[in-house]
Amino acid sequence: MRDLVIDNTLDSFFWAQYADLWHNSKNRSPFQAPGILQFFSQKYTNSVIAIRLLREQSTVGAVLLKKEKNIYSFLSDLKTDANFFVFRNNCSDGDIDNFFAGLLDFIKQQHSAVIFNNVASWAGYFPVFEKCAAK
C-alpha cells in the first residue's frame, strides 16, 4: 500500500527517515543531503513542507518544498539551481508515478503553483514525471 504524506513539522523521526532514504537513493545529490536541507528548514520553519511517499511504512520518495505566498519551490533552491527528487533504489515506476500524481494533486488542491527550477531531465524518474505532468 502506498500513501502520500505531507509533513509540516520536520522532527527527528522525519530526519532519520529522510537520511535513510537519501543514503539508499538512486541519485544522491549533495544538495538534497539531510544536513543541508535540515539547516535550511530551520531557517524557514513555517514555510517548509516535505512530501513523502510511503510504501509499507517506509519512505520511498520525497521532496522538500518552500512556500512563499501560493508558490512552492525546492528548498534546495537556496543553494543550487539543479534540483532532484529523492527516490529509494528499489522504487518502482508505479511508486514514482504515484508520488508525482499525489504531488501535483496536492498543489492543485492548495490552489498553488510549483516552480521546478532545472529539474534533472537525465534522472531515471524524469519520463514518469513528464507523463504525470502532461495529464
List each language-model region with its residue ranges.
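N-acyltransferase acceptor-side catalytic subdomain
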Residues: 1-135
